[in-house]
């Protein structure tokens, strides 16, 4: 890894089976954090973009950085969590146009992260908060999408039993100004939604 002022960690966070219980596998976050710790210098910013459980930025990534370097967060270096919000196939447009939420360790980290992301997010807004809020926000966004996909598919099953056209039901229900039911499909999938921690 080459030295830089800012390091962005964006690695998979799959599930692992542990005694019939699904748990998030943070080994990639841990490995990337250890790699960054080998080149981390005073004044650097480390950003975690992976979808992770709340408190991962502080308890996992930062704990490794402090242990491996002997440096202290907010004194020697800064951390942030800025979850990615892009759709495969539309990445460049969405990087530029989508709002970004950045959870930071302090005001200095917020200033540094906002300065960086402002060069990328040219048509969206940037919102600064703490890292736990940013981590939770990403999970809430994905859960909301999961639930909406599930509702559409459950409606398809119900309408099939009632021998009525689900697309007609959804089209008419969506005439309500606060209703936006999705079209039924194959269910939740892809590289992100199906494996949220």
Residue ranges and their predicted role:
Residues 1-197:
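Structural/interface elements that position substrates and couple domains in central-metabolism enzymes
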């Amino acid at each position: 890894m080459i030295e830089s002022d800012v390091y962005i960690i964006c690695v998979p966070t799959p599930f692992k089976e542990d005694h019939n219980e699904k748990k998030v596998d943070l080994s990639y976050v841990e490995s990337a954090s250890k790699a960054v710790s080998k080149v981390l210098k005073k004044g650097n910013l480390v950003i975690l973009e992976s979808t992770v459980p709340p408190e991962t930025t502080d308890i996992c990534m930062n704990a490794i950085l402090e242990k491996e370097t002997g440096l202290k967060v907010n004194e020697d270096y800064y951390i942030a969590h800025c979850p990615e919000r892009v759709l495969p196939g539309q990445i460049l447009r969405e990087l530029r146009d989508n709002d970004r939420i950045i959870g930071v360790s302090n005001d200095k980290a917020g200033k540094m992260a906002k300065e960086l992301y402002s060069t990328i997010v040219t048509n969206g807004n940037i919102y600064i908060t703490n890292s736990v809020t940013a981590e939770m926000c990403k999970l809430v966004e994905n859960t909301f999408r999961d639930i909406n996909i599930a509702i559409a598919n459950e409606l398809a099953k119900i309408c099939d039993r009632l021998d009525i056209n689900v697309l007609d039901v959804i089209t008419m229900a969506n005439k309500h100004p606060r209703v936006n039911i999705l079209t039924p499909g194959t269910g939740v999938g892809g590289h992100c939604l199906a494996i949220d921690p």
